[in-house]
A protein has these predicted regions:
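Secondary-structure edge/capping motif, primarily at the C-terminal ends of alpha-helices
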Residues: 68-69, 92-95, 123, 127, ...
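Hydrophobic alpha-helical connector segments
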Residues: 67-94
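Amphipathic alpha-helical packing segments from all-alpha helical-bundle domains
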Residues: 80-83, 101-133, 140-155
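Append "Primarily bacterial transcriptional regulators
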Residues: 11, 30-35, 43, 85
Length: 165
């Protein structure tokens, strides 16, 4: 494994460890660097900020997980994703608390939107029927459907991570 990936993984694990004791909002790049025993220069060589590090963690771990899944078996894939989030719930609960510019919620919402577009859309004829009924184009109906499902999953995930409200 290239040294660059080892450094990224070390920074990632450090952030995951720190979020167990501090809120994401209060964790600074200095905290990550001190705990990981690397310089700020090293951190900024790999990531533009802590938000980019959090997104990298999500992206690399989700990609690795999805590569192991049979994507044709939707329920098994969903089950694997649920297990991943359960195993990493403290980390993601910490990330989901932060709202605002560069928030993980936005990145996660975009991931969900893409996932719905690829794996959970109804058949084309159903989208066309909904579009006809609503007086919109099929593309508009598809985007509305995808965004609605993605937003519902995001809200359910947020509530679950906050303690099951």
């Amino acid at each position: 494994m290239p040294e660059s990936n080892l450094t990224k993984k070390a920074l990632a694990q450090t952030l995951k460890d720190l979020i167990h004791t501090q809120s994401f909002e209060k964790i600074g790049v200095n905290d990550i660097c001190d705990a990981c025993q690397v310089s700020r220069k090293t951190f900024y060589y790999h990531f533009r900020d802590k938000y980019a590090l959090a997104e990298w963690i999500f992206d690399t771990e989700i990609i690795a997980l999805l590569q192991k899944c049979d994507l044709e078996d939707r329920w098994a894939t969903i089950q694997a994703l649920c297990r991943y989030f359960y195993d990493n719930r403290v980390f993601y609960a910490g990330l989901m608390q932060f709202q605002g510019q560069n928030s993980f919620r936005y990145h996660f919402a975009e991931f969900l939107f893409s996932a719905v577009e690829k794996f959970l859309l109804p058949e084309r004829r159903e989208i066309c029927a909904a579009a006809d009924f609503g007086g919109v184009t099929p593309e508009t109906a598809q985007a509305f459907y995808s965004r609605s499902i993605a937003d519902a999953v995001l809200l359910a995930m947020y509530r679950w991570l906050r303690g099951g409200e």
